Design a protein with these regions (language model features):
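C-terminal accessory subdomain/extension
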Residues: 270, 275-380
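Active-site loop ensemble at the mouth of alpha/beta enzyme cores that anchors a bound cofactor
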Residues: 221-303
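N-terminal glycine-rich anion-binding loops that anchor highly charged ligand groups
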Residues: 2, 21-52, 65
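Active-site-proximal beta-alpha core segment in soluble small-molecule metabolic enzymes
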Residues: 43-179
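Conserved, mostly hydrophobic/aromatic
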Residues: 22, 45, 75, 135, ...
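Generic N-terminal amphipathic, Lys/Arg-enriched alpha-helix
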Residues: 1-17
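Active-site loop/helix belt of alpha/beta enzymes
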Residues: 139-253
Length: 380
């Protein structure tokens, strides 16, 4: 493919990425965090791409956050060496962690139980290596972690230090923020996140245990935090791309969404009000993250080739390789005439879930011309 080729020439379905929107989204959050005096440790789990990583990291070596050891291995090969593996560690993963640290990667891990801590201590003793650990704190009862006032936080910290691991600090993630909407609710979630992490850090220090890192973050809370006192870093990832869920929460506008799926119209069922496209769940994913929001976007919002949304036109059903596009229930909008062979773009509900269906980004400039292809990787 030649540079500056029209997206009309692409084989569909294809994953499109507006590099100008990516730059704008990164600059927005970086400016906000600079104003709060806290650095960003970007999450690369959505990107899974070295070119995107280089755009969002402050240095070529990091820092960054990942969600799989495959990401650690791929980014380390590209020169990224300051990485937080932000999924609770399983004992079976520790040999790979040790191998990566032996190769020079400053890889830290997270845990929230004595069993995990014992496995880490055993690995440290057997390998004569200190593995850096952050204790995961639960800020909102939505996922993993210990409550900040749980005495296990201190017990785990002591076990790690006495057993030869490195207690690097605490971390938390406000999973509940994805169920909030509006500035006030998201600010409240951000403050709960900060308070939980800082309280746990204070408890560790009061027990004469080290806690240099206090790590918080999600894309919604990162944008609406007003005070990050006591926090040493913020983690966020989908802000680079944004999606319909983030738009529904009020974190971004639809015009900020940098990722879309290009699809071809392959049929009509006019009596049913259906347009058929060649992007099914293997391209869009089956994420229904907007289902409980004020506006349900189905499986994604349909746009014309320029990226302008069709009024109330959404993906309403998915099969493996077919998508059905129709007007949302109750709409009074006029059903558009989109002939077979036409190209449309779908804005995804969940950028992370959609991106993982593809092995490359078709990178667009400000004129929506394809100027590059950036490879993605997958796996665990």
């Amino acid at each position: 493919m030649t540079h500056s080729e029209s997206i009309k020439a692409l084989t569909t379905p294809a994953l499109l990425l507006s590099v100008e929107r990516v730059r704008r989204n990164i600059a927005r959050l970086q400016s906000h965090l600079n104003g709060l005096g806290v650095p960003l440790r970007p999450h690369l789990k959505t990107a899974k791409c070295t070119e995107v990583a280089r755009m969002v990291m402050t240095t070529a070596a990091g820092p960054a956050t990942v969600s799989t050891l495959r990401e650690v291995e791929q980014f380390a090969a590209a020169g990224v060496h300051d990485l937080l593996y932000a999924v609770g560690i399983g004992p079976d993963k520790l040999p790979r962690v040790l191998a990566l640290r032996k190769a020079g990667v400053d890889l830290s891990i997270i845990l929230d139980s004595l069993d995990q801590a014992r496995a880490v201590v055993s690995a440290c003793r057997d390998s004569k290596t200190r593995i850096p650990v952050l204790i995961e704190i639960d800020a909102d009862d939505q996922r993993a972690g210990l409550r900040a006032d749980d005495l296990l936080v201190i017990e785990i910290g002591r076990l790690l230090v006495q057993g030869g691991a490195e207690l690097r600090g605490v971390m938390t993630h406000s999973g509940g923020s994805y169920g909030q909407a509006g500035a006030d609710a998201l600010y409240t979630a951000a403050e709960a996140e900060r308070s939980a992490a800082v309280s746990a850090a204070t408890a560790l220090r009061s027990a004469d245990l080290p806690c240099p890192v206090v790590s918080v973050g999600s894309t919604p809370t990162a944008h609406f935090a007003r005070d990050l006192s006591g926090v040493t870093e913020v983690r966020a990832g989908v802000f680079v791309f944004f999606d319909m869920v983030m738009a529904g929460l009020g974190v971004c506008e639809i015009d900020d969404i940098a990722m879309s799926v290009l699809a071809t119209v392959i049929g009509h069922q006019s009596a049913k009000g259906w347009i058929l496209i060649d992007a099914g769940w293997t391209a869009l994913s089956q994420d229904r993250g907007t289902a409980h929001q004020a506006v349900d976007q189905g499986y994604g919002l349909a746009c014309d080739l320029s990226g302008a949304p069709y009024p109330d036109l959404i993906v309403t059903r998915l099969n493996q390789e077919h998508g059905i596009v129709s007007l949302r229930s109750g709409s009074t909008a006029r059903f558009p005439n989109i002939p077979i062979g036409s190209r449309i773009r779908i804005l995804p509900n969940h950028a992370c879930a959609t991106a993982t269906q593809f092995d490359r980004y078709h990178v667009l400039n400000e004129k929506d011309q394809v100027t590059d292809i950036w490879q993605r990787f997958s796996g665990w």
